[in-house]
Curated annotation (Swiss-Prot):
Glycosylation sites: N179, N322, N332
Annotated keywords: Cell membrane, Glycoprotein, Immunoglobulin domain, Membrane, Secreted, Transmembrane, Transmembrane helix
CH3: annotated span: 224-327
Residue runs in coiled coils: none
PANTHER family, per the entry: TAPASIN
GO cellular component terms attached to this protein's record: immunoglobulin complex, circulating; plasma membrane
Sample GO molecular function, one term: immunoglobulin receptor binding
Record topological domains on the Cytoplasmic side: 371-398
Start and end residues of each stretch annotated as Hinge: 98-113
Region described as CH2: spans on this chain: 114-223
Protein name: Ig gamma-3 chain C region
Domain of life per record: Eukaryota
Length: 398
């Protein structure tokens, strides 16, 4: 029977956080069948990750994933464990937070005893880049509350813009989850200019299971915006024998990482594409790849596909690059095939020429040798005939 996993954060004790780095983890337990995938910060955190092989016990699988981060970045920066179980269509997110201490600490002890985990977790998400940059759309900042228990299901969410409370947010009814908890989503519509100018948005969550309200704050990342470079890459010739081909869009050299990449076909939005998360490059900018899968026939018929990019540093925040099977591409492929054929023919000609040349040399050498031998024999015979027999002549004179 298909069973969704439960996810538990693995948090170090206070004595394990004094070094230059700290190891955090996620325990994914009680799922069937395999596989599950575990990512950190939606794939943005990839270095220092170790995943322990899954173990089958009592008919269910378990595995753990660990990530090592600098102590200076946690808990000041968010670390999230993302778990996906395709078989049950389950996607879970777990924020790795410090342990919640009990009120009392023994005298002379630097660590509170009996640290416990519990209560809801709260995440805040920025508006989608396309929503924040296109005037025709409405950007929203979203607060997600997870692990709300059945015993204390009531959640109250308050919103603040630059520390001034606002009342324009809407909160959805709580949703039951696979692990017998609830999820609550609250969204705050915002003004484009407020986000672009760096205003600070905060959600404050109250719940009886929390010892104190949880606050999460977000604003537009600071830093000088850098314009992305967009390149489209046609499918390789080797794919043409298959039913589907892959079109690629490389977007590089951009900052900030907030970006939207979509595909269109003849002006209509496509769905069958996948984007990598923005990846931090060595120079501090970001890059990503986007892959669109299409029928080979559509590509061969010359349909026009468009990689559409939205980013704050672009003129009018938007750019497009078209990709289609062009006559030049066909000519290049034809020329390449012709060149391959010509090379094959050339090698055949060269082989025949070398063979004939060697045969000719052997024949000429044989004929020359025969002629030399014949001439030498003739010369010897002539010399023998021309030399007088002096002994006979002397005998006759006597």
């Amino acid at each position: 029977t298909t069973t969704a996993p439960s996810v538990y954060p693995l948090v170090p004790g206070c004595s394990d956080t004094s070094g230059s780095s700290v190891t955090l983890g996620c325990l994914v337990k009680g799922y069937f069948p395999e596989p599950v995938t575990v990512k950190w910060n939606y794939g943005a955190l990839s270095s220092g990750v170790r995943t322990v092989s899954s173990v089958l016990q009592s008919g269910f699988y378990s595995l753990s994933s660990l990530v090592t981060v600098p102590s200076s970045t946690w808990p000041s920066q968010t670390v999230i464990c993302n778990v996906a179980h395709p078989a049950s269509k389950t996607e879970l997110i777990k924020r790795i937070e410090p342990r919640i201490p009990k009120p009392s600490t023994p005298p002379g002890s630097s660590c509170p005893p009996g640290n416990i985990l519990g209560g809801p977790s709260v995440f805040i998400f920025p508006p989608k880049p396309k929503d924040a940059l296109m005037i025709s759309l409405t950007p929203k900042v979203t607060c997600v509350v997870v692990d709300v228990s059945e015993d204390d299901p009531d959640v109250h969410v308050s919103w603040f813009v630059d520390n001034k409370e606002v009342h324009t947010a809407w909160t959805q009814p709580r949703e039951a989850q696979y692990n017998s908890t609830f999820r609550v989503v609250s969204a705050l519509p915002i003004q484009h200019q407020d986000w672009m100018r760096g205003k600070e948005f905060k959600c404050k969550v109250n719940n009886k299971a929390l010892p104190a309200p949880i606050e999460r704050t977000i604003s537009k990342p600071k830093g000088r915006a850098q314009t992305p470079q967009v390149y489209t890459i046609p499918p390789p010739r080797e794919q043409m024998s298959k039913k589907k081909v892959s079109l690629t869009c490389l977007v590089t050299n951009f900052f900030s990482e907030a970006i939207s990449v979509e595909w269109e076909r003849n002006g209509e939005l496509e769905q069958d594409y996948k984007n990598t998360p923005p990846i931090l490059d060595s120079d501090g900018t970001y890059f990503l790849y986007s892959k669109l899968t299409v029928d080979t026939d559509s590509w061969l018929q010359g349909e026009i596909f468009t990689c559409s990019v939205v980013h704050e540093a672009l003129h009018n925040h938007h750019t497009q690059k078209n990709l289609s099977r062009s006559p030049e591409l066909e000519l290049n492929e034809t020329c390449a095939e012709a060149q391959d054929g010509e090379l094959d023919g050339l090698w055949t000609t060269i082989t025949i020429f070398i063979s004939l040349f060697l045969l000719s040399v052997c024949y000429s050498a044989s004929v020359t040798l025969f002629k030399v031998k014949w001439i030498f024999s003739s010369v010897v015979q002539v010399k023998q005939t021309a030399i007088p027999d002096y002994r006979n002549m002397i005998g006759q004179g006597a």
